[in-house]
Amino acid sequence: MDTLSENVSADPEVMHGKPVIEGTRVPVEVVLNTLAEGVSIEEICKEYDLSEEQILSAVNFAADKVSKEEYRALEA
């Protein structure tokens, strides 16, 4: 298991190696998609038995990854 950031890890044996909330099988992707659907942090905590700190760690992990990417528009 690799710790990718605080509260986020990846293991090829867990969820096909996708980043998950450490100690769970909840992918960061699921947390982000659920937030994007307008579900509150409190509701996500209850649904997935997570803490607010874990949710915010997932958001920070994703923000860090996006900030390091370079995007270019494709020409038509």
Regions found by a protein language model. Name each.
Residues 5-26, 72-75:
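Short, Lys/Arg-enriched anionic-surface-contact patches
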Residues 27-30, 34-76:
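Long, charge-rich, low-complexity alpha-helical segments
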